């Protein structure tokens, strides 16, 4: 996932295979909900499994009937209620795309470029502890837990290095009327 964003397909595949009793479904905003927060041992966080509200129904319909949850926590983002945002949804956004293997050459090029930019150290990555898998987890301590929840790793410890440090990116998106901050007259 580090060099392509196939989170939606991954979350669908894991949710289908696990058939958890408690399922969290939403955008990345829901990824911080962890299994330890719930009384059930049968939990999966499918945060990132949807970007538009219409995708939630498709996600659930694409689960085998015996894998569907007993309890669903559907996390709704504020922009789901903005008619301007929902009007730009691609017509095929709800279509389920299969999980595909990454293009190794593309991933290698991106990894090399990130290494040359100093985004990670080979010694640090190669010296990671057992149970840490992937470049993002090794380099930044960020990634998915087994229950589907997510940790932002060093981004939490050093928010000043974030793309959105001091809400700079958020304020730019609001000013530009774009990327989930489209202006709207009335809630949808």
Each predicted region: which residue ranges?
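Secreted/periplasmic serine-hydrolase-like ester/acetyl group-modifying domain
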Residues: 89-188
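Membrane-embedded segments
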Residues: 19-114
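Non-catalytic accessory regions outside enzyme or core folds
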Residues: 6-9, 36-38, 154
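Short, flexible loop segments at the rims of nucleotide/cofactor-binding pockets, characterized by
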Residues: 2-4, 48-51, 185-186
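N-terminal secretory targeting modules
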Residues: 1-19, 67
